[in-house]
Amino acid sequence: MEILKGLPVANSINEQLIEDIKNIDGELPHLAIIRVGERPDDCSYERGAVKKMDKVGVRCTTYTFAADISNDEFQKGFDRINNNPDIDGILLLRPLPKHIDEKAVENRIDPRKDLDGISPVNLAKVYAGDETGYAPCTAEAVIEMLDYAGVDIKGRRVTVVGRSLVIGKPVAMLLMKRNATVTVVHTKTVDMAATCKHAQILVAAAGSAKMIKPEYVADGAVVIDVGINVDEEGKLCGDVDFEAIENIASIATPVPGGVGSVTTSVLAKHLVKAAHMR
């Protein structure tokens, strides 16, 4: 089994972006990262994103709000960032605290700056196959991984495990745009294992540690693991029981070190795209 790591994929994207940035008129692209509170995973992702933006040579400003900020104050602060003409793109770290109206933010973010595809406008564009929109970065990272590995998507049977708006549904749409035959399975699916085993490409995005066992995977299948979980031993793991499928899959992505490594490079790619569309 070939282990498809994310770092070479990310580096390939980064190299292309560094060249693309040279062709941008005016100021360098400018990303705003918005974080509410001090959730460790948010802080970790923020650090990685800041590092990635520095690596490709774009501007990045972080905006941090207290976890107990009122909804009204946060919405006002968000609007100031959203309406700043110097900012090309916005990354909002989610989930927000429960007292913050996340739907209001999704509806008011400028679709041209919505780099992680949270607005209804961009989700609709992804579903319509309109390339002027932005897909969620993690969903697009799945496609980048497959392309880098030289996996032919056209005509392939693909099963996506999970139907979230963040990964499952948009990645299914991106795969269909590439002419894959896509099946989406979820917690209500009858005989999920049999449906998954029919797939030539299996994308696991359920958020359930090591749920994808050997009986889910066809011989020679390509397995892309989007899950990020903690196992019983407190170790980071994906949705796939990686060691158990080693002698079955032809290609598989690890966790950590797989799709997650590519997500911030896709974010940078979206930022450069936004700057070109000024």
What are these regions (language model features)?
Residues K103-L123, G227-R278:
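Rossmann-fold NAD(P)-binding glycine/threonine-rich loop
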Residues L28-E38:
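Short beta-strand segments enriched in small/hydrophobic residues
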Residues L91-I153:
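Anion-binding alpha/beta catalytic cores of soluble intermediary-metabolism enzymes, centered on
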Residues L93, A205-A206, V226:
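Short, well-ordered coil/turn residues at beta-beta hairpins
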Residues M1-E27:
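Positively charged, low-complexity intrinsically disordered leader regions
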Residues V36-V50, G133-V222, D231, K235-E246:
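Glycine-rich phosphate/diphosphate-binding loop of Rossmann-like nucleotide-binding domains
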Residues E73-P85:
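Short, well-structured alpha-helical segments in soluble
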Residues M53-A67, V182-V184:
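Short beta-strand elements in bilobed, periplasmic/extracellular small-molecule ligand-binding domains
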